[in-house]
Regions:
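ATP-binding N-terminal substructure of ATP-dependent carboxylate-amine bond-forming enzymes
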Residues: 1-96, 130-133, 357, 364-369, ...
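Active-site nucleotide/adenylate-binding loops and adjacent lid/helix of ATP-dependent enzymes
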Residues: 100-190, 209-211
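Glycine-rich phosphate/pyrophosphate-binding beta-alpha loops
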Residues: 152-153, 222-225, 230-231, 281-295
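Phosphate-binding site of ATP-dependent enzymes
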Residues: 168-226, 240-250, 267-268, 274-276
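Flexible, glycine/charged-enriched surface loops at secondary-structure junctions
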Residues: 191-192, 259-264, 312-318
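Conserved metal-phosphate-binding beta-hairpin within the catalytic cores
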Residues: 203, 253-289
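Peripheral (often C-terminal) accessory segments that flank ATP-dependent C-N-forming ligase machineries
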Residues: 304-392
Length: 392
C-alpha cells in the first residue's frame, strides 16, 4: 500500500493517477471528506483529517502496512522530514530537512544559483534599523514583494491578524513603503525584488544520485491572478529548446544536493534571451497535470528510483500538450474582461482565445479525465454545496 498525502488538489490527484495506473494500491489523505482525490477509482482507502501528521500517520502505517509515502504540500513535507526513521520500514519519499530548508529560503536558493552561474533578480531584504524610504527611493520599479520563507512567518503574521500574501507588486516607492508598513508590528518584512520581464518558464527535473533521470518543461500561457499566481493554462515546451538553461537547472539542483522532483522556475525574456530565477519548488508543483498528460510521470519516477531502486534515465517521448485549470482560468478571463484599462480589442481577443482553447485537441485538464471521471463530478458537487452554504 502506498500513501498519498494531500488529495485535496489536482496535484495530489495527479500523483494518485500516475501510481494507480501502474497498479499500485493507494491510500489517500485529504483535509476534508470531500477531498478531490478520494473520488478517484485508484484509491482503495481514504482518510480525512487535518490533524498534525504525527498524531495519526504512525498508526495508519502499521494498520495498512504502508510501504511508501508521498506528499507535496510544504507543511506535510516539513512534518514528514521530521518523522523519517520513525515509521519502521516505510519509505518516506520526501527531501531531507536541510535541503528542503534551502529551497524554501529564497536567499539561500539565490546564493546557490549565483554559484552555478544563474542570474537572479536584484533584491533587498528590509531589516530593523534601515532607512526604508532611502532604500525604496533607490530601487527600479515595479518591484515584487514576497516572503523568502513563508513557513517561517505564517504564525507571526496570523498573530497580528495579517494574511500571508504569496506575492504583491508595487509601482512606486510610495506603494512599496505602504506595503512594508503593514508589517511593522511583526518586526519582519518580506523580500523586495526587481520585476523581470518575460514569460514564466518552468523546468522540471527528477534528481537521483546527482543527475536528472527525467526532464520536462513548460511555459505559462495564463495565470490567476493575472498579475502572478497559479498557472491556469500552460503548454509543454520541447526539450530541444532552452537546453543550456536546463543544464544550469540540473547544476543548481546538484549544487544543493537535491534528490527527487523539483521545478526550477524562471522568467524568460525572448527579446533578450535572459533567464531570471524566481524560485525552486522542491516538491510536486501546481502544473504537474500537464507533465502527466504529456507523458512525464514524476510521481512514478520517484517511486521507481527510490523504492524499486532503478537508477537509469527514463526520458520518455513527450507529447505536445496544453493543460487547463478551468476555474482559475475562468477567473482569469473574467478579470481581463472587467479591466477597463485594457483596450476593448485586447479583451475581445482574449475571450475568443479562451473559448477556442476548448476545441484545441492538444488541451487536457487538471481535473477532468475520461479514464477517471469521478473526481470531476465530486468537485462539481463540492462547488455546488459551497455555493448553497454561502447563500443560506
Amino acid at each position: 500500500m502506498i500513501a498519498v498525502l494531500g488529495a485535496d488538489s489536482p496535484i495530489g490527484l495527479t500523483v494518485i493517477r500516475e501510481l494507480g495506473e501502474r497498479g499500485l494500491p493507494l491510500l489517500a489523505q485529504g483535509k476534508t471528506p470531500q477531498a478531490l482525490g478520494r473520488y478517484s477509482k485508484h484509491v482503495k482507502h481514504f482518510v480525512g483529517t487535518s490533524a498534525p501528521i504525527a498524531e495519526w500517520l504512525p498508526q495508519l502505517v502499521a494498520q495498512h502496512g504502508i510501504e511508501a509515502i508521498l506528499a507535496y504540500s510544504e507543511h506535510h513535507l516539513l512534518q514528514l522530514a521530521a518523522l523519517k526513521g520513525a515509521l519502521g520500514d516505510c519509505r518516506v519519499l520526501v527531501p531531507d530537512a536541510g535541503r528542503l530548508a534551502t529551497v524554501l529560503d529564497k536567499q539561500r536558493t539565490f546564493a546557490a544559483a549565483a554559484r552555478v552561474g544563474i542570474s537572479v533578480p536584484a533584491s533587498w531584504s528590509p531589516a530593523l534599523g534601515e532607512n526604508f524610504a532611502e532604500k525604496a527611493a533607490a530601487l527600479a520599479y515595479p518591484v515584487a514583494i514576497k516572503w523568502p520563507d513563508p513557513n517561517d512567518v505564517a504564525s507571526a503574521l496570523a498573530a497580528q491578524g495579517l494574511d500571508l500574501e504569496k506575492v504583491e507588486y508595487a509601482k512606486s516607492a510610495q506603494e512599496l513603503l505602504a506595503i512594508l508598513r503593514r508589517y511593522d508590528a511583526v518586526g519582519l518584512w518580506p523580500l523586495v525584488q526587481t520585476w523581470c520581464p518575460g514569460q514564466g518558464l518552468g523546468q522540471m527535473l527528477h534528481m537521483h544520485g546527482g543527475r536528472a533521470t527525467l526532464r520536462f518543461q513548460h511555459k505559462r500561457l495564463r495565470e490567476w491572478p493575472p498579475t502572478g499566481g497559479v498557472s491556469s493554462f500552460c503548454e509543454a515546451v520541447p526539450l530541444d529548446q532552452h537546453q543550456a538553461q536546463m543544464d544550469l537547472s540540473e547544476a543548481l539542483l546538484r549544487e544543493i544536493g537535491w534528490e527527487g522532483p523539483a521545478m526550477v522556475e524562471y522568467r524568460h525574456d525572448p527579446a533578450t534571451g535572459s533567464y531570471w530565477l524566481m524560485e525552486i519548488n522542491g516538491r510536486f508543483w501546481g502544473s504537474i497535470p500537464l507533465a502527466y498528460h504529456a507523458g512525464a510521470h514524476f510521481a512514478w519516477e520517484t517511486y521507481r528510483c527510490r523504492v524499486l531502486g532503478q537508477s537509469d534515465a527514463a526520458q520518455p517521448e513527450l507529447k505536445s500538450r496544453r493543460a487547463r485549470y478551468v476555474i482559475p482560468d475562468s477567473k482569469h478571463i473574467v478579470a481581463i474582461l472587467r479591466d477597463s484599462r485594457l483596450p476593448l480589442g485586447r479583451r475581445l481577443r482574449a475571450t475568443i482565445g479562451f473559448l477556442a482553447d476548448f476545441g484545441d485537441p492538444r488541451v487536457r485538464y487538471y481535473v477532468w479525465s475520461w479514464r477517471d471521471p469521478k473526481p470531476f463530478f465530486g468537485d462539481m458537487l463540492a462547488i455546488v454545496r459551497r455555493a448553497l452554504r454561502r447563500g443560506s
